[in-house]
């Protein structure tokens, strides 16, 4: 798979071309470990699908205002190893934020990132980081269009529950920076959500 030939929707050089391997590139940060276990992958996937079903069934009471309306076209996500590989390459740069070009041959790819830190020698489990994205639902106004909501406050939530997204793959790295124990999680989603002229899902 030659990532250097992929032309991303948003331009730029593909992450898997630019960095080319899973070797961590973290400067003076001390890398403790990287990658997700099979169990962690299953947990992340289950957390996404449980939350998508909660939304679909109209059980999410939070919002600005809540509750969130039920969905009629919400499907379960499946894990995709290629998305996970590209997410892991980006996580291994230890740069908090979004990369520019992560699309794969079959579709454009969206992304959620989360970073937590502790002065104690411990790291939050990935599901806790995923729940931080879910919590953004408290700022979502379902009475407005997606494009009229404040994207900076709700973009992780909306990608999680974007109905047309079918697949997910994530990467993770744990490192120490200035005595802070940090856990950085990157999840890539395909096809990408958060297209301004579309809605999250069809309401019932």
From Swiss-Prot:
Location in the cell: Secreted
Tissue expression: Expressed by the venom gland.
InterPro entries: Allrgn_V5/Tpx1_CS, CAP_dom, CAP_sf, CRISP-related, V5_allergen-like
Signal peptide stretch: none
Listed GO CC annotations: extracellular region
Residue ranges constituting the SCP domain according to the UniProt record: 45-189
Family: Belongs to the CRISP family. Venom allergen 5-like subfamily.
Stated name of the protein: Venom allergen 5
């Amino acid at each position: 798979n030659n990532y250097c030939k992929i032309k991303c929707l948003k331009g730029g050089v593909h992450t898997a071309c630019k960095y080319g391997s899973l070797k961590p590139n973290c400067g003076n940060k001390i890398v403790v470990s990287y990658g997700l276990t099979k169990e962690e992958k299953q947990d992340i996937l289950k957390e996404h699908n449980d939350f998508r079903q909660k939304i679909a069934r109209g059980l999410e009471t939070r919002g600005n205002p809540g509750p969130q309306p039920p969905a009629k076209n919400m499907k379960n996500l499946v894990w995709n190893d290629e998305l996970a590989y590209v997410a892991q390459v980006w996580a291994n740069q230890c740069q908090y934020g979004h990369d520019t070009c992560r699309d794969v041959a079959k579709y454009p790819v969206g992304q959620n990132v989360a970073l937590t830190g502790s002065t104690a020698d411990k790291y939050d489990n990935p599901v806790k980081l995923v729940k931080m994205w879910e919590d953004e639902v408290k700022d979502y106004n379902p009475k407005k269009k997606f494009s009229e909501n404040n994207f900076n406050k709700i973009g992780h939530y909306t990608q999680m529950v974007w109905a047309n997204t079918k697949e997910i793959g994530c990467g993770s790295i744990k490192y120490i920076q200035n005595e802070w124990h940090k856990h950085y999680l990157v999840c890539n989603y395909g096809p990408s959500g958060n297209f301004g002229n579309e809605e999250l899902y069809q309401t019932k």
